[in-house]
Design a protein with these regions (language model features):
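PRPP-associated nucleotide enzymes
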Residues: 1-154
Length: 154
């Protein structure tokens, strides 16, 4: 099942309301930074970070960041992928909100959480616009608070 957020992005009022709702949940977490996965996580992750007064760190595909990076590989349904962050982006003790547009199997979000924790930072919560509950991605994020605005199936 493919879910597309681009119609949401086209509607200025819906986009603003989405960022508002994500921020309403995230603001009390008192995070230092939002770390979002490439590529669709960037779209709302940066806006969310700005709204709650936090920094933003992109978790990118290999070879896309110019400085020293930390990386983690993770399994996909059809192979293996990897994500990287700048090695010096996360300080020990930082509180982090992990954000992506969609929680499906949980592999991408779990990889971002691993990058955050390897750096000595704390995952305060994971935030998503949509969740495909029937794929049970939450089980890959056990031990982390998970919030999604919309959930399909369970």
């Amino acid at each position: 099942m493919f879910k597309d957020i681009t119609p949401l992005l086209l509607d200025a009022a819906a986009l603003a309301a989405t960022v508002d709702q994500l921020a309403e949940h995230a603001a009390p977490l008192d995070v230092d930074v939002v770390v979002a996965a490439e590529a669709r996580g960037f779209v709302l992750g940066g806006a969310l970070a700005a709204r709650i007064g936090a920094g933003f760190i992109p978790a990118r595909k290999p070879g896309k960041l110019p400085a020293d990076t930390s990386s983690v590989e993770y399994a996909l349904e059809y192979g293996v992928d990897a994500l990287e962050v700048h090695r010096d982006a996360l300080g020990g003790g930082a509180r982090v909100l992990v954000h992506d547009d969609l929680l499906a199997t949980g592999g991408t979000a779990a990889a971002v959480c691993e990058l955050v924790e390897r750096a000595g930072a704390e995952v305060a919560a994971c935030s998503f616009v949509m969740e495909l509950g029937f794929l049970d991605g939450r089980s890959r994020l056990e031990g982390h608070a998970v919030h999604s605005l919309i959930a399909y199936g369970s």
